[in-house]
């Protein structure tokens, strides 16, 4: 997409969208407002031309294969989750955990949700959907607020995914670092070695993961979360009276079919197959990509670098769905018509989320067209001294991610800016740690994404937990 420089006015669309989301509690309308005003600015103030461009931009989201795959596998995940619910997988899991004393306590339930979040690390949105769907019945039974569940969903998604190279997030970052390696900006270090060295230095992500376990174990509730938890315990209300859940419970939570027995395997087998397929998918797409790039005898890094994270995740969800269908056929759980109806019902339940993702992608596109991220980065570049480079890179990355709602877009902007700058400093015999600066980009991007009300991960967390979105953002912010 063509990118121009519009100066300080480039930050108006994200600022407007965030302000409207907080003021109106309507994320969809807020994103639409940000998209529209952005394209009006791009059109030189012409509202008619801006409106036409805004409509085209929302349609053109599907022109990007990666974005389209994310939307498709999110809808398919809705189908898989509802089949697991109706097919007795979720009840089977809940029956299994109910045998253990720890599952009957608030601490145990929160720890269970946190551990599930660690285990499903293939993609942040899938982590949120699985944790929310599996944990919500137990949290409601124990009167744990939906805001707390949304916090656990959010804090075990992006912060966990960014610490691992073998998932969609790792593949994206390695691809960006490989582009810098081709320009000679990594010196004698490989992209994978830089990524792995940056992991323990990614203080925000590491601390976010540690904190969610501390909160789960100690039940440490502060600020708005303390109010939400007190309401849930004393009044038995898991939602505030004025809450507006992103999706109603009855849309995304259906009971097990009466003739179907609870079976733990109906949840674990599809999820395990999905995770395995993601690893295999990265290997397959990476091998194909390496061959197309004329890489002879590709190694592990070459395969990971050439692999497609979004394709692998989509294959994983498709395999999980196929396994769930196979199990149901073997168990004679559903008729073919029931399969079709449930699949569409599950995808339909996720549809509001898919719409929000389209709008979030479209807002990111208008920010790219206006040069929002590059303008913010260029504004602080004169202040990037060797001592301040890592802290400022973190702050700028956080601001861009918060404003645009995308950590991946932030990575693309800031790695392109920060890595060559570090290379320049090092060529002048001024030592600046490249892994530290890369970790600042990644940590800042996750921090901004974690806090932003227009972030897709935050919206998915709210939806998966059936929580009010702005309540989720407000209660999570003190921890973030």
Residue positions per predicted region:
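Re-entrant/interfacial helical elements at transmembrane boundaries that shape
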Residues: 92-95, 126-138, 167-185, 212, ...
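Hydrophobic core segments of alpha-helical transmembrane domains in multi-pass membrane transport
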Residues: 12-23, 34-41, 73-82, 114-118, ...
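Alpha-helical transmembrane segments of multi-pass membrane proteins
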Residues: 106-120, 144-170, 185-207, 228-231, ...
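Membrane-embedded alpha-helical segments and adjacent helix-loop junctions characteristic
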Residues: 48-150, 333-428
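Hydrophobic transmembrane alpha-helices of multi-pass solute/ion transporters
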Residues: 2-79, 92-96, 100, 273-358, ...
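Transmembrane-helix bundle segments that line or gate the permeation/cavity pathway
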Residues: 128-132, 136-140, 148-254
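Long, contiguous bundles of hydrophobic transmembrane helices that form the permeation core
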Residues: 208-306, 318, 322-341, 464, ...
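Transmembrane alpha-helical segments and their short flanking loops
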Residues: 45-58, 166-204, 211-212, 294-298, ...
